[in-house]
Regions:
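Contiguous beta-strand/loop segments that form the cofactor/metal-binding neighborhood of enzyme cores
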Residues: 187-273, 311, 317-332, 349-350, ...
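Conserved Rossmann-fold NAD(P)-dependent oxidoreductase catalytic core, especially the SDR/UDP-sugar
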Residues: 123, 463-514
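Predominantly a Rossmann-like dinucleotide-binding segment in NAD(P)-dependent oxidoreductases
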Residues: 127-203, 208-212, 525, 557-561
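Beta-loop-alpha module in the N-terminal Rossmann-like domain of NAD(P)-dependent dehydrogenases
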Residues: 18, 53-110
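N-terminal Rossmann NAD(P)H-binding glycine-rich loop of SDR-like oxidoreductase domains
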Residues: 11, 374-396
Length: 707
């Protein structure tokens, strides 16, 4: 039997889910190739999952031949072009949601697939979510509650990109995009249950004002008429509490399908008198909910221990969606075909039509390096610290070149005529060399990337920092300001006073990967600068807070959810907070300060609340019941050892947890930043009320609503 050879078009985060789903659902399928314009990303995935073919574009893959099926995981606005080319090349296509960004594109793909005799399927995997499937069996297959008379759907979910202010993401570019990106999940279940709606009435709340020229439609309501069944839909994006559920009211009971909790609740009737019926039905419902909750926890743990196949809802939905697609290939059909995908896009287009088109926002275009002749280059300048830095540089009238991988979707301050946006990747030497051409000073805010093991961290975090320094020296850069982190220091001794001359942790190899990477990057940079004569200054900010980042910093503890902060210790020691504005000021000062080459400076402000105090301030400002839970390092270490033991039992090769790292995360050491104040002329905010206004009060309402 000839094996089906499959290619993945796109090596982003969802590709791993497709690979795992393919291996579980269709082990007879050979994952033969992976394609991505970022070839290094594709090579990394190929190495991780033993995929033999790696290509930089689909034309290269098509020319090589031998591919039967392609999973299109490219950005949504590329779906139509990529899928159309693959179909024309005689390749069956499995499209990630949304099918395309317009009904016209969907119809063109449907016609192309039909004319060429190819299979076109859409991955609306939440139609295969086990909780939804359980509800569907009760409502449709078994008809246990009679006809569905009304359906009420709530989809109120967090949105990571909104909290991280990643406004360059495709979903923020126009109102329909968030619907295509997120709303298709609940819509797919509505259409699967009741069919496409014949009529739609939609409304949207006043949008959030994310930035000058950019609004975001975060709340929607819609009435859909699906046959004789009315559907009420509520959508909210960027919410604190994850609530995804639907209630089906039927002739003989109601069903609540809670996708967030993985539970289905059925309320019916028994044969008893009403007072007794309520008791019997209520007790049965309680027992059923408890049983589902226990079963879900048991399934997760046994799956984690590999005592049974992996069974979390998302994985199962991906596995079963992929399985259904491949099961249909012999008959040349797809369970969720182009018509299904097009119906969802049609609903999104209709809903978006209820919202006035936003005014065109001013966006900078990527330009060639010689356009402004700036003497200052900033790598990683579009992040949290970078945005504040660029704002201050622009306010001072300084011309600056910002290197960004998303050069076509930036907002103020990056639209200033003093800012040159250059598309580039700090991991690519040729991009770094091109960016530094003609400059005299540079700032490196880019962290370089992460990794699952030390070799990858050394390549991304340490290697990229060193490569920027090497390119800076070769380009004749007079001063390179590298922005690292206090994480590379050992900060667990309450008796130690830490200054800029305190060296990186001498036992960094015993620390967690991030801390070790920061420590080794500092060491490598100092060694290179000493040997080459590069004018290097290293700045190590503390816990950076302020407008534009999450309210709760990871230096406070870790979070099983954002309402509960599990402290790194008892939470009674002063923490090394610093305002983002003060960090930006220090970077600018370090560009020109005399006699600072070859030195490091820690950036910690003069207002230093404890973890308990800071969490309490945030809770008060946001009017939310956020709690700090003090811990002892011994307990934390024991818990980490337990988790490490589980990973080892499942065959994972992982290093044991470092108690030294946990102690250091408590940040008990004392910081003396007198050297930064003396040498740089740095003056961080010392007024407690002003600190609270900038670090805490800004989170009362991160975004205003547009008029």
């Amino acid at each position: 039997m000839t094996r089906t050879r499959t290619a993945l078009i796109g090596a982003g985060f969802i590709s791993a889910s497709h690979i795992e789903g393919l291996k579980a659902a269709a082990p007879e399928v050979e994952i033969a190739a992976i394609v991505d314009r970022n070839r290094a990303l594709a090579e990394g995935k190929a190495k991780q999952f033993a995929i033999p073919g790696v290509y930089g574009d689909i034309e290269e893959m098509i020319a090589a031949g031998g591919i039967d099926v392609a999973h299109v995981l490219a950005p949504p606005d590329a779906h139509a072009a990529v899928a159309g080319r693959l179909l024309a090349a005689g390749i069956d296509v499995f499209l990630e949601k949304p099918m395309a960004t317009s009904v016209a594109d969907c119809e063109a793909l449907i016609a192309s697939a039909a004319g060429l005799g190819r299979v076109l399927g859409v991955n609306q995997n939440f139609v295969f979510h086990p909780t939804y499937r359980a509800a569907r069996r009760i409502l449709i297959d078994q008809r246990r509650l009679g006809p569905i008379r009304s359906l009420h759907v709530t989809f109120s979910v967090p949105l990571r990109q909104l909290g991280a202010r990643q406004f360059g993401h495709w979903m923020f570019q126009k109102p329909v995009n968030i619907l295509l990106e997120q709303a298709v999940h609940p819509l797919s279940q509505i259409v699967d249950l009741l069919g496409p709606p014949a009529a739609i009435t939609a409304r949207a709340a006043a949008p959030l004002q994310l930035a000058p020229g950019l609004t975001f439609q975060d709340r929607w309501t819609a009435d859909l008429a699906c046959g004789d069944t009315p559907v009420q839909l509520y959508l909210a994006f960027g919410q604190r509490f994850h609530a995804w559920r639907f209630t089906a009211i039927c002739d003989d009971g109601l069903l609540v399908c809670d996708l967030s909790a993985g539970r289905v609740m059925v309320q019916g009737r028994a044969q008893w008198p009403e007072f007794l019926d309520n008791l019997v039905v209520g007790a049965g419902m309680a027992g059923h909910i408890a049983g589902q909750s226990i079963g879900g926890a048991a399934g997760y743990l046994t799956g984690l221990l590999k005592l049974r196949p992996k069974s979390d809802g998302f994985f199962v939905s991906m596995r079963d969606s992929i399985k259904a697609f491949y099961a249909g290939l012999p008959s040349r059909t797809a369970p969720l075909d182009g018509c299904f995908g097009a119906a969802l896009v049609q609903i999104c287009e209709t809903m978006a039509g209820a919202v006035p088109a936003p005014a065109a926002s001013r966006r900078p275009a990527a330009v060639e390096p010689a356009a402004l002749n700036p003497d200052l280059v900033v790598f990683g300048g579009t992040g949290f610290i970078g945005a504040h830095l660029i704002s201050r540089l622009v306010a001072a009238g300084r011309r600056v070149r910002v290197v960004s991988r998303a050069a076509d979707s930036l907002l103020p301050p990056f639209d200033s005529p003093l800012v040159e946006i250059m598309r580039g990747n700090v991991a690519k030497r040729e991009d770094v060399e091109r960016a530094l051409a003609g400059a005299t000073v540079a700032v490196n805010l880019a962290h370089g990337g992460g990794g699952a093991d030390w070799e990858e961290i050394k390549r991304t975090m340490v290697g990229s920092a060193l490569m920027v320094a090497e390119c800076a020296k070769a380009a004749g850069i007079a001063r390179l300001v590298h922005v690292g982190s206090i994480a590379g220091l050992y900060l667990g001794d309450p008796a130690e006073v830490v200054t800029g001359s305190t060296p990186p942790d001498p036992e960094a190899e015993s620390r967690a990967l991030y801390a070790r990477g920061k420590a080794e990057a500092d060491r490598a940079l100092f060694a290179f600068a000493a040997g080459s004569g590069l004018g290097l200054v290293i700045l190590r900010p503390g816990l950076v807070v302020g407008a534009g980042t999450a309210a709760l910093h990871g230096g406070l503890g870790f979070f099983n959810n954002e309402q509960h902060v599990i402290g790194w210790n008892e939470g009674t020691n002063a923490l090394p907070f610093v305002l983002v504005e003060d960090v930006a000021d220090a970077i600018i000062l370090a560009l020109d300060a005399p006699n600072v080459e070859g030195k490091a400076y820690n950036l910690v402000g003069d207002v230093r609340p404890t973890a308990r105090e800071f969490v309490g301030l945030i809770a008060q400002a946001t009017r939310r019941p956020i709690a700090f839970h003090p811990q002892y390092v011994q307990w934390l270490h024991a818990a980490e050892l337990f988790k490490w033991g589980i990973k080892r039992a499942t065959g994972k090769s992982v290093d044991p947890p470092s108690k030294r790292d946990l102690i250091s995360r408590g940040l008990r050491a004392q910081f003396d930043c007198g050297d930064a104040k003396r040498d740089l002329g740095w003056r961080p905010v010392a007024d407690r009320d002003l600190f609270i206004a900038r670090a805490v009060d800004v989170h009362r309402a991160p975004f205003e609503r547009a008029a």
